[in-house]
Amino acid sequence: MLNESDQKIVQYRITRKYEEMVNSHVIMDNTTNKSSWEKIKKAQLFCDFLEQKNIFYEYCFKHPEVLGCDESKSYYQRFCSYVENYTICKNLVVHERKGKHRKFLIITDQSKQVDLKKLKEVLASSKLEFISEEELATLLNTYPGNVSIFNLLYDRDQQVELIIDEELLTSELLVFHPLYNGMSMFIKP
């Protein structure tokens, strides 16, 4: 448990039109360093950007930086006991090894395994492989473990094709990072 001197609470919640304002918390604790503060600021600016574009989310909270779905699962269970019926999204960026060199952002339930051979057939593409760290940084301004649907904002040339698992559309809430893997956002599909 955090003591008061270690806590700094930033309360914010964007609500849908005509709904009552309800608070949600982003807790800044003693694990938050200067670099993290800058990333948190960027994520909060991104949340403001979403509001300006009338894209609303339900909750957003800070947690230690995570580099994958398995690592993040325990934080969601701990911090989100009050939230029901959410799906943590797995975000994978792959590209064709040969041919047209198409690039894809694959979004599915974090509990699912993605079979690249089967996906290749579904997408009628050549052999698929994960994109390099360098290309990920150049294309989507991110790094492995920090990929989110929101990184498509950096794909100005629209090189990345978005592939979303249809089952996600039946979830009440989807969980994505708001451009920083130390925060998570719950948003309706």
Model region roles, listed by residue range:
Residues 2-189:
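Extended, low-hydrophobicity, polar/charged segments
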